[in-house]
Amino acid sequence: VRAENGPTCIVMRPSADDPNKTKFTWLLSIDLKGWIPKTIINKVLSQTQVDFANHLRQRMADNSVSKEMAPAC
């Protein structure tokens, strides 16, 4: 499969409503260039993004991850 990645961006900003929360915005543009219908691809990709966010949330909540270890962008 020869996929093409378009513009992709992850933005994390403090929540305006709760200082203990972060607003996570992920823009993803990918064309898999295959025969699979785009409706199926979009559903799978959106679920993959949800899974990624859940794993990220779980990792950040883990007590073994300290703020000092978090990489800077």
Swiss-Prot record:
GO terms for biological process: cholesterol metabolic process; intracellular cholesterol transport; regulation of steroid biosynthetic process; steroid biosynthetic process. One of its GO terms (cellular component) is mitochondrion. Pathway: Steroid metabolism; cholesterol metabolism. It catalyses: cholesterol(in) = cholesterol(out). It is found in: Mitochondrion. It comes from the Eukaryota. GO terms for molecular function: cholesterol binding; cholesterol transfer activity. InterPro entries: StAR, StAR-like, START-like_dom_sf, START_lipid-bd_dom. Its main location: mitochondrion. Residues 1-65 form the START domain. Keywords: Lipid transport, Lipid-binding, Mitochondrion, Steroidogenesis, Transport. Plays a key role in steroid hormone synthesis by enhancing the metabolism of cholesterol into pregnenolone. Mediates the transfer of cholesterol from the outer mitochondrial membrane to the inner mitochondrial membrane where it is cleaved to pregnenolone. May interact with TSPO. This is Steroidogenic acute regulatory protein. It comes from Salvelinus alpinus.
